[in-house]
Amino acid sequence: MQTSEREGCGPEVSPSTVPEATLESLPVPTKLPAFDLFNLVLSYKRLEVYLEPLKDAGDGVRYLLRWQTPLCSLLTCLGLNVLFLTLNEGAWYSVGALMISVPALLGYLQEGCQARLSESELMRRKYHSVRQEDLQRVRLSRPEAVAEVKSFLIQLEALLSRLCGTCEAAYRVLHWENPAVSSQFYGALLGTVCMLYLLPLCWVLALLNSTLFLGNVEFFRVVSEYRASLQRRMNPKQEESAFESPPPSDAGGKGALVDCTPAPTPTEDLTPGSVEEAEEAEPDEEFKDAIEEDDEGAPCPAEDELVLQDNGFLSKNEVLRSKVSRLTERLRKRYPTNNYGSCTGCSATFSVLKKRRNCSNCGNIFCSRCCSFKVPRSSMGATAPEAQRETVFVCASCNQTLSK
């Protein structure tokens, strides 16, 4: 220590000799190996080849857990539960020894008993070993190498994004950012510890296996599909009758009469042109008024029943046709056709945004702004019980007349 301090601070050293000493004491920089991104990509692909058996095993496990073949998944779940519950300690040691010895024996037989094949034969068969050798001796052009590097970087970025998302979720649970999730996590950990302490290991493994197979969404989807198919097989007649059954008729003679009404012919269409183009918000209000007034002015239903009893089925059809024709005529008188396509009050042209609306009292065509007054149907002479509650649209002049 003292000699070094003297060498650094002593006045004997001349200034001319200092740079030479520092140059001699500097270490010679070693040449760092160049980073080859293409070799990194090749190493990644070789790693994929080596891990391909594990990837296939993971795909098989996911195939069973997703119940894509329900019978295989069910047999696997039941078989594993039976093994977990019935095997004793000696049997488990035997299973472990078997799982170690079988891969070792297969690898020895594949390597020792296989005949040495030529290069052309290996290229023809395209085994995994050939793929590894191809990756070691691969020669690619510059565009192909750039494409491989880009693909590798994309996969690496996706992997790092998933890892970052997992770490962020773990930190959110540990920092209690969401108390519900954190409480569920720690509750599950405490429950697992208690279960490991109270239950035997075989029961713990059986419960874990049952949770993996029966606690996912795919299992409930398969169960719902099978339940629906069983219901269709057991009750085919009820479904057919449900599709073919007519809608329920109203109580009283009027409902039965309306149900028996035949479909009107094109000459007896009940929807005039002005009613077809009315606003879709309340398409049936105007028809209810006309039908109710027609029912009030129609002859007594008892007289119609007497005529039907006297004249038979043909007279019944004639009565129905006459009733439909009277209703059609009343609708045509009530809703005159306006061929000009403009509002009677403000002369605004109807369009997609400017809807037309019929006044329920005078029958003229207005826009939705001019025909925006609502009055109860009872003010127009309707006597039905629901007429006190239901309202219809009328124009301003009709609103003043009906409000007096």
Curated annotation (Swiss-Prot):
Annotated function: Key regulator of RAB11-dependent vesicular trafficking during neurite extension through polarized membrane transport. Promotes axonal elongation and contributes to the establishment of neuronal cell polarity. Involved in nerve growth factor-induced neurite formation in VAPA-dependent manner. Contributes to both the formation and stabilization of the tubular ER network. Involved in ER morphogenesis by regulating the sheet-to-tubule balance and possibly the density of tubule interconnections.
Modified how: Phosphorylated. Phosphorylation is induced by NGF through the MAPK/ERK pathway and modulates interaction with RAB11A.
Main location per the UniProt record: membrane
Binding sites annotated in the UniProt record for Zn(2+) 2: 359, 362, 395, 398
Annotated localization: Recycling endosome membrane; Endoplasmic reticulum membrane; Cell projection, Growth cone membrane
InterPro entries: Protrudin, Znf_FYVE, Znf_FYVE-rel, Znf_FYVE_PHD, Znf_RING/FYVE/PHD
Gene responsible for this protein: ZFYVE27
GO molecular function annotations of the record: zinc ion binding
Acidic residues biased stretches: 276-286
Region listing for Disordered, in residue ranges: 1-20, 234-286
Residues on Cytoplasmic side: 1-66, 110-187, 209-404
Sequence ranges on the Lumenal membrane side: 88
Name by which UniProt lists this protein: Protrudin
Chain segments annotated as coiled-coil in the UniProt record: none
Source organism per UniProt: Bos taurus (Bovine)
Membrane topology recorded in Swiss-Prot or TrEMBL: Multi-pass membrane protein
Region named Necessary for interaction with VAPA: 286-292
